[in-house]
From Swiss-Prot:
The lineage of its organism: Eukaryota, Metazoa, Chordata, Craniata, Vertebrata. Pfam families: ATP-synt_8. Its main location: mitochondrion. It is found in: Mitochondrion membrane. This is ATP synthase protein 8.
Length: 68
């Protein structure tokens, strides 16, 4: 059985890995990456509060003297 000659393997594997690295880098350079989304300003909704028009006077406690 003949013996497998592995002396040339490093000279074939090294350029192959370098080529794969360069091709990957070029593909990544040409791809478009989207920016992270910016938050939209929220519009505050004004809800109808039924208690707002009712409380028009400020009542003081009966135990306290009247304040002016």
């Amino acid at each position: 059985m003949p013996q497998l000659n592995t002396a040339v393997w490093p000279t074939m594997i090294t350029p192959m890995l370098l080529t794969l690295f360069l091709v990957t880098q070029l593909k990544m350079l040409n791809s478009n990456y989207h920016l992270p989304p910016s938050p939209k300003p929220m519009k505050m909704k004004n809800y109808n509060k039924p208690w707002e028009p009712k409380w028009t006077k400020i009542y003081s406690l009966h135990s306290l003297p009247p304040q002016s």
